[in-house]
Amino acid sequence: MRRTFFKSKIHRATVTHADLDYEGSVSIDEDLLDASGILEYEAVHVWNITRGTRLQTYAIKGERGSGVICINGAAAHLNKPGDLVILATFAELDEAEARGFKPTVVLVDRKNKIVESDAVEIAGPARRVSA
């Protein structure tokens, strides 16, 4: 049996652009894609911390080193520049794969520069705040 597991996330990224007229997707700085292991065209969940909205789209490469997080298409109605978001992916794993699997968590600052790229999830009331 295969199960769905959390694979990777970019935590508390800042939306830099929202382009209503683009076809869709989320443009993500290529440095962040590399650090998180998110591939171009991979399904990505966008959880907006600022507005409480959630949606699913797909990733496309943004300019390397730019810090870009651009929400494209109709999703631009739900995400605006300056909003904080979590970008997350999931993977289907069988039990043997899942036993040793650890997700990738990338922490970024307010300019979407990598602060930590092998972060450990903090459970419960402990709180992590980006610089």
Curated annotation (Swiss-Prot):
Membrane-spanning residues: none
Enzyme Commission no: 4.1.1.11
InterPro entries, sorted: Asp_de-COase-like_dom_sf (IPR009010), Asp_decarbox (IPR003190)
Post-translational modification summary for this protein: Is synthesized initially as an inactive proenzyme, which is activated by self-cleavage at a specific serine bond to produce a beta-subunit with a hydroxyl group at its C-terminus and an alpha-subunit with a pyruvoyl group at its N-terminus.
Gene3D superfamilies noted in UniProt: 2.40.40.20
UniProt keyword Cytoplasm, yes or no: yes
UniProt pathway: Cofactor biosynthesis; (R)-pantothenate biosynthesis; beta-alanine from L-aspartate: step 1/1
Residues where substrate binds: T57, G73, A74, A75
Reactions mediated catalytically: L-aspartate + H(+) = beta-alanine + CO2
Family the entry assigns: Belongs to the PanD family.
Record keywords: Autocatalytic cleavage, Cytoplasm, Decarboxylase, Lyase, Pantothenate biosynthesis, Pyruvate, Schiff base, Zymogen
NCBIfam families recorded: panD
Pfam families: Asp_decarbox
Free-text function comment from the UniProt entry: Catalyzes the pyruvoyl-dependent decarboxylation of aspartate to produce beta-alanine.
Cofactor descriptive note: Binds 1 pyruvoyl group covalently per subunit.
Cellular component GO terms held in the UniProt record: cytosol
Protein name in UniProt: Aspartate 1-decarboxylase
Location within or outside the cell: Cytoplasm
Biological process, per Gene Ontology: alanine biosynthetic process; pantothenate biosynthetic process
Subunit structure: Heterooctamer of four alpha and four beta subunits.
Record GO terms (molecular function): aspartate 1-decarboxylase activity
Modified residue annotations for Pyruvic acid (Ser): S25
The keyword Magnesium belongs to this UniProt entry's keyword annotation: no
Active site location: S25, Y58
Cofactor(s) this protein cannot do without: pyruvate
Position of the signal peptide: none
